């Protein structure tokens, strides 16, 4: 199992980005979270297979129908302790 932390900027808050991310992450059998940040970005921490993380990253560039992702930063991180994928 691998884990990654993504920071997304652009129009990613108030456009169902986190809810859509949760749906996609669950479909890919990932665990972790998606959280709004004070600076207007969204943090996504996800853990699972390397292929599932790649698929999530690819999908997240599109995000929800109303989102407009401007940039993505990906860094390795510790595997989250949660067994589910949550938004907050």
Curated annotation (Swiss-Prot):
Active site per UniProt: 18, 36
Keyword Zinc: no
Keyword terms of this UniProt record: Hydrolase
Transmembrane segments: none
E.C. number: 3.6.1.7
Entries under InterPro entries matching the protein: Acylphosphatase (IPR020456), Acylphosphatase-like_dom (IPR001792), Acylphosphatase-like_dom_sf (IPR036046)
Domain Acylphosphatase-like as annotated: residue spans: 3-88
Swiss-Prot/TrEMBL catalytic activity: an acyl phosphate + H2O = a carboxylate + phosphate + H(+)
NCBIfam families linked to this entry: PRK14446.1
Family recorded in the similarity comment: Belongs to the acylphosphatase family.
Protein's name according to its UniProt entry: Acylphosphatase
Organism: Xanthomonas campestris pv. campestris (strain ATCC 33913 / DSM 3586 / NCPPB 528 / LMG 568 / P 25)
Organismal lineage: Bacteria, Pseudomonadati, Pseudomonadota, Gammaproteobacteria, Lysobacterales
